Amino acid sequence: MICFMFEKRIQCFVILWLFPFGLFSQSEYAGSRLEKIFSKKELVVGVNKQYEPFYIENPKDGFPGVDVEVAKLYADYLGVSLKIVPLKTFRQFSEDIRSGKIDLALAGMSTDLNRGKQVTFSEPYLVTTPAGLVSKKILPPEPEGNIVTSRRFMSLGDLSTLSGLVSFSVRSNTTNHIYLQKKYAKLPIYSYLSDSIAVDNLLSNNVTCFVADSFFILTLLQKNPSLKANYLPLLGSVQEEYISAALPQNDLIFVDNLNFFIKELKRTGVLDDLRSRYFNQNNWVK
């Protein structure tokens, strides 16, 4: 039933916007990447090869990934075909956008000032936050019966009361790493080249809290629900992180077009449905 309702909403959205784009002319977009897209009748989108469920390699039917679904909707909106190009690093995304190998990137990509010097970011289509998976061993025992305690652990900020017990693992040079360095500079912070190594250090009891963005934590729990027995997810917002599309620099026509599209996805509830399908359910997990 949930899947049917989602498909119906998508169909209504596409039908609503399909007709006007038959009226577009390339001359309206002279000098913009949109002119090239309409000329070749194809939208080329870079996606993050290593970040499920934004992109899922060899996916289950009906679950290609959040970013692939958004890209397909945008291609339909423009009235062109879609080509997906899986890439790995921000450098690859920015260079391929600049050279024209891809038109834009939808890659579960968070914005920051340094990245903004190399690409133009769209309005965010998702919002995340630094989040954690903390060992229950260092938390106070659960209240019994009708006992009510004032301390609840909902976000990374709540760990400040356990400073002597907390140590962190995190992927190096990320917004999450920077957040920890500012918030918990006096506590042990171990940074690693990948999230998987950082998770392994939590599971090996080398640290007591793994830190990543909230979507990564939710994905980890969808794939490994048994983790909830020994670890508590801390998903409350401590700092907004914007997930945005990356586009060519100074292409205001292209950015304005995509921003309007994203606003309509938000207004019609399509993005809420996508977030629920991939981060609150595990039907996509292989």
Residues covered by each model-derived region:
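A ligand-binding cleft/hinge motif common to bilobed small-molecule-binding domains
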Residues: R91, M109-Q118, Y179-K182, V199-Q239
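Beta->alpha turn/N-cap motifs
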Residues: G46-Y51, P86-F90, L104-D112, S135-K136, ...
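Extracytoplasmic small-molecule ligand-binding "clamshell" domains
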Residues: S27-M109, L113, K117, S191
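Solvent-exposed, polar/charged alpha-helical surfaces in well-ordered, non-transmembrane soluble domains
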Residues: V68, K72-D76, R91, E95, ...
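Bacterial N-terminal signal peptides that target proteins for export
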Residues: I2-F13
